[in-house]
Amino acid sequence: VPFDDETQAPEESVGDVRWSSTKIGDLAADAGIGRIHVLAWRDLDDVEAGGSELHASAVAARWAAAGIDVVMRTSHAAGSPPRARRDGYEVVRHAGRYLIFPRAVAAELLGRHGRRDALVEIWNGVPFLSPLWARGRRATWLHHVHEDMWPMVLPPKLARAGQLLERRIAPPFYRRTPIVTLSESSRSHILDRLRLPADNVHVVPPGIDPGFSPGTEAP
């Protein structure tokens, strides 16, 4: 998303990130991928952000360091500007917790975030249903099946609707979409509960931030 002088995005940082970006850049160049759009429910600056948001931000930062243009579209985060730049990638925060889904899709269809070479959808309970409208390279990140979590965050009727959407309505549309999850246990649960083709569900371990290192033994 281009910024003019009046809406120049502030620089934000989530800490020191150290890695070699050469291999990522080479892989992207060979695949003809120079610009990636990411659709996410929440931003890292959201007060309720968790592992999904941290993972998305870390990956986007590494892509940006490899020379890939990354635009991440999320819902707004209280106290944060609508647009920002964090660790080399652009963040666009518009719409509330529920309107983010139709508005993000509309923005992509209307080309408001510019061209893209690939699309990443983060399926965090409610999907963006990218297989129905996105053409070209795309993948979906699905960390886990929410299932029993719906009643914890929504009233009974809405919780049942969420469970129905996640387990029955959405999965058939994703049968030809590459699904990326973080562990073999999550993959097994996805295959069991969502009945997606095993060949399309891939495990990519998240790794460990280099800021963490083994400590000394306690005396």
Where are the model-predicted features located?
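A short helix/loop element that forms part of the nucleotide-sugar donor recognition site in Leloir-type
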Residues: 83-84, 209, 214-219
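N-terminal strand-loop element at the rim of the active site
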Residues: 14-33, 42-45, 62-96
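Carbohydrate-associated surface elements
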Residues: 185, 207
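A short beta-strand/loop micro-motif in the catalytic core of glycosyltransferases
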Residues: 175-184, 190, 202
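A short, charged, and often flexible helix/loop element on the N-terminal side
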Residues: 84-114, 151-158
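Membrane-proximal helix-turn-helix segments that form the acceptor-binding/catalytic region
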Residues: 157-180
